[in-house]
Amino acid sequence: IHYAVIDQLTDQPVGSLALMRIDAKNGVVEVGHVHFSPLLSRTAMATEAHSLLMHYVFDTLGYRRYEWKCNSLNEPSRRAALRLGFQYEGRFRQALVIKGHNRDTDWFSIIDSEWPQIHRAMRQWLAADNFSADGQQLRTLESFR
């Protein structure tokens, strides 16, 4: 299920992300196909988009586990997962063949017992008083956890 991220100031799409590998019986879902334009990447709006989707998964759907998987060589994706509160679970070596080459996949997750603390930290980080007049964060997201 793909979701568009819409900039509320311009009413224009600036990115998308998807819920994949949906396992309702076990309450497990993966976030993936995250595509953010330069207007969205590395912004408070990007963090808010992830926070809103996590809130939907945990608090509306009642799921137990939220997964993030990425190419082990994709350092920006790995950093984003960790920054958002995902726990690194391990590397699945040679998990895929992409364009004729082996690809290792790193797995990350947030589970329902971790979600309240992560959600609280995201709300505190996203609060207007955590940003200067020019939009710079005063404290990191990690510092709220």
Residue ranges and their predicted role:
Residues 9-145:
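Acyl-donor (CoA/ACP) binding surface of acyl/acetyltransferases
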Residues 1-4:
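A short helix-loop-beta-strand connector motif used in the catalytic cores of GNAT acetyltransferases and
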